[in-house]
UniProtKB/Swiss-Prot annotation:
UniProt name for this protein: Protein FYV5
GO biological process: cell wall organization; intracellular monoatomic ion homeostasis; pheromone-dependent signal transduction involved in conjugation with cellular fusion
UniProt source species: Saccharomyces cerevisiae (strain ATCC 204508 / S288c)
TM region positions: 26-46, 56-76, 82-102, 106-126, 127-147
Localization terms from the record: Cell membrane; Secreted, Cell wall
Amino acid sequence: MQYHSALYVYIYVTFTTIPYKEKPDIISICFSMLSFVFDFSVRICSRTLESFSWSLISSSAFKVVSAFSLAGSCVLASRSSVGIIVSLLLFNFSTCNFVLFLSAVLIDLFFCTFLPTPTFLPTPFFFMLHLPIFSLLNALELLYLIIAGLHI
């Protein structure tokens, strides 16, 4: 399950950081609903796997996924009041820790706001792994979120 969660983190963050500027309301609501559905389904699956010894790993990966998906929705919906309200309402039904969620929001805001985004690439990071500085930042970001998820 932790491998599927890591793959979901890559896919979700990649698509939520694409700068949709025309209709952020519809897209942010769709991604928020997608994160809520995934959050609910993984919660059910993790409860059935509590007897296994690696349930802690899957639970930590699930917290990282929840934080990243909701943070991506909030960052994407920051241009619209409807999207941000939906994202915050869905956060109340999530199981991720608020500190981890806030950390993911700040990391996403840093990547989307302060780092330069080339026009020929659709997203600020995860498509820029061939550049050394972004590879280092991606590695540090994922390492931080994994360690934070294991200790929360």
